[in-house]
Amino acid sequence: MQYTQWEHRLDMLESKLAFQEHTIEELNLTVVQHELEMARLREQMRLLTDKLKAAAPSMIASQSEETPPPHY
């Protein structure tokens, strides 16, 4: 191969590498944002669950309060 062909191939590889580095950085930022959003949503879900448990007693009777089925 001639020198110019090697230069061209090297330029192409450098260009691809730069693009890949940029893409990886963007993906990393997206993953970090998603992790923060998931943490926020988990905390919100925990708070809502606690609020729901405190606001309304369970509508399901405990085992001792249930009447036995008719076949007993």
UniProtKB/Swiss-Prot annotation:
Family, as annotated: Belongs to the SlyX family.
Gene coding for it: slyX
InterPro entries according to UniProt: SlyX
Protein name: Protein SlyX
Pfam short name (any one): SlyX
NCBIfam families linked: PRK02793.1 (NF002750)
